[in-house]
Amino acid sequence: MAYEKAPAFERLATSTPGDTSLVATMTSADHKLATGFYEFSVFALGEWKATHNRGLDTLVFTVPRAFLEQRPGKFQALFTAMCEALPIVHGHAGYGVNLPPMELNANEASEYFYARRYGPGIDVGDPMGYSTVMLEGAIKTVDWIVALNADLVRAAGGADSLTLPPDWYVRQPFGDGGLIVQAGVAPQASVSAGPGKPPLPPPAYVLLDAALRPIIAEKMDILQSGTLDSTAPLLNTTIATEAWLKRFVLEPDQVTEQWRELHKTPTVGSSKAAVAANLSQFRKIMGLPEPVPSNGFGYDGGSPS
């Protein structure tokens, strides 16, 4: 349905019966079977399923890579504002492959190909898929940005236990004990290992994975299913899925080397001001309450209170 003919999200939310799940997707694609750079999707369970613990509601939004360069700080600010506005359990942001909303399974082979080609920093699997929405006591993966509610922060050992150097990691508090962690100044798919060699995981992601390992899922339902006649490789077995979940896990001596490699990458300090300014605007536009006090490591760059 064309954008100008589609009902507004607010109308959908208020007109959908309480016992009915709400599923809506808006994309910049020019055809329902095509893929767009921009996407905004909502999956909300009906009241009965929600009260009987049948999974999590999901919000997905995507922008092209160029958006991060042309609108510095906007994406991080929007992600943070959404975390402050909604009762989130967990969330993450980074590189991914947009697939046609109406043809996910038929295009999963392309998602798998790009993830193998460009590196482990590429997310795989439908954010609104069964294996993801059923995760509550664990997270699927680390990424450029990770959001955790208070329960997950405690399960990870507490915010103070995260030994993440502030020059390369933003730690933005939100809500009643929640935490957003940004790993590095920009998302990464991989680090080159040289001609003819598989790409290596980004050091910032490896170290964040090690810090959050207690709450990262070790098992999940399959991340991809494909079609009945598909012969392309996919993450459509539990073994392949579990291997993907551990793609950032390295031997202890290799983790030590990642600390040295991290120090060769750009720091986050100069990017914080743009995020803070945009976040302030979003809070006003969305009517959000006053933010929690600064911890000195967030986007505001202030001193702990």
Residue ranges and their predicted role:
Residues 1-117:
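Internal, hydrophobic cores of structured domains that mediate oligomerization or house catalytic pockets
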Residues 101-304:
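C-terminal interaction module
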